[in-house]
Structures are given as structure tokens and as C-alpha cells.
């Protein structure tokens, strides 16, 4: 219940921030960056509530998913939801501050945010019970509970390492951090999937 309240507070804070700052913002707001500079600008009425609405939809979706989840998985889902909502809110604040004329290193913020998200999410991933919503979900991890535990424990470590690398590199790589994030996350998913399949074959090869 406490984690649910935190989610609601973050979403409400996002809407409240947009409402309070609306009159102070210019008529055009950046929504995309290249080299830490705005690359795409859209009119204020269209963009200022995009992130708050996305956050609301995201929260409602996760809330519906938790209804039939076990207590442990429900807690992990809300943890993931809260982390993502915080990341989106920080991105919203960064966008609004840039629009108000403040200098904000958006590439660094995104890199650090995603890195921390992966560290927290990866660390909690190993605690997930077998399910179809969170964790490393493949036909073989869902089929064998032991493979699920081994695969998610391995993926948890890989994602934490991936998060640390992204967080550190975000201080040095500038606009390339987005590409680096995509490559590292995809690599982590591929390695984790292959590792879980290896566990499955090792445990079930003689059956």
C-alpha cells in the first residue's frame, strides 16, 4: 500500500509541476536532444502534459498487473514502477528547466538515471517468483523453477554490472550514451537469455 501511495504522489507531483510552471514556459519546448542541445521543438500546449499523462498510464497499467500477482512480485512490480516514474519525472523536470533557460546536461541525467534504474531493478530481479510479468521470462525459465531462479540470478548480476558501466560512462561519453545504453542492455538480455538456456540444457539434458 505504501509503494502504491508513492506512485500516486509522483504522478500527482508531475501534473502539479506542469500546471504551476505552465505560465512561465515559452511557447515552444524541446522534446529531443542531440549533443546535449535541442533537436526537436514542439508547441507548449501539446508537450507539457505528455510525460505526466504517460506516467499516469504507466502507473495504471502496473496497478492492474499487480492485482493477481503474489505479494512478493507485487512489491517488485511497484518498486519497478516507482523507479520508472521517478526517472520520467526527472526527465520532465530537466525538459522544463531547459525550456526556462537553465543549463542542464540532459545526456548525463539520462545516463545516470538509466544506470541507477538498472542497478536497482537488476538487484531486485533475482527475488522475483516464477511469473509471466517480471524477470527473465523465456519458455525454459517458465517451464522449470530451478532454471528460473538460476537464470534470474545471473541476469540480475549482469544488469547491475550494466547499470554501473552506464552510470560511469555517462560522465564521459556525452551524446553517445544513448547508443551505449541500447547496445549494453541488448547485450545483457542476449547473454542472460543464452545463460538461462544453458542452465536448462544442463539440468534437463539427461531427461
From Swiss-Prot:
Effect on the protein of changing residue 84 to T: Ability to bypass the requirement of SdpC binding for expression of the sdpRI genes
Location(s) in or outside the cell: Membrane
Swiss-Prot/TrEMBL induction comment: By Spo0A during nutrient starvation, through its direct negative control of AbrB, repressed by AbrB during regular growth when nutrients are plentiful, and also by SdpR. Induced by expression of SDP (active peptide of sdpC).
Function: Immunity protein that provides protection for the cell against the toxic effects of SDP, its own SdpC-derived killing factor, and that functions as a receptor/signal transduction protein as well. Once SDP accumulates in the extracellular milieu, SdpI binds to SDP, causing sequestration of SdpR at the bacterial membrane.
GO biological process: response to toxic substance
Disruption phenotype: Results in increased SigW expression which is dependent on SdpC. Results in weaker growth (70% of wild-type cell density) on LB medium, with more pronounced effects on sporulation medium (15% of wild-type). Concomitant deletion of SigW results in greatly diminished growth (5% of wild-type on LB and 3% on sporulation medium). Over time, single SdpI mutant stops growing on sporulation medium, while the SdpI SigW double mutant eventually lyses. Deletion of RsiW restores growth of the SdpI single mutant to near wild-type levels.
Transmembrane segments: 5-25, 47-67, 78-98, 100-120, 150-170, 171-191
GO cellular component: membrane
Alphabetical keyword list: Membrane, Transmembrane, Transmembrane helix
Domain of life: Bacteria
Protein name: Immunity protein SdpI
Lineage of the organism: Bacteria, Bacillati, Bacillota, Bacilli, Bacillales
Organism expressing this protein natively: Bacillus subtilis (strain 168)
Variant or mutagenesis effect after changing residue 156 to T: Loss of ability to promote transcription of the sdpRI genes in response to SdpC binding. No effect in ability to confer immunity to SdpC
Topology in membrane: Multi-pass membrane protein
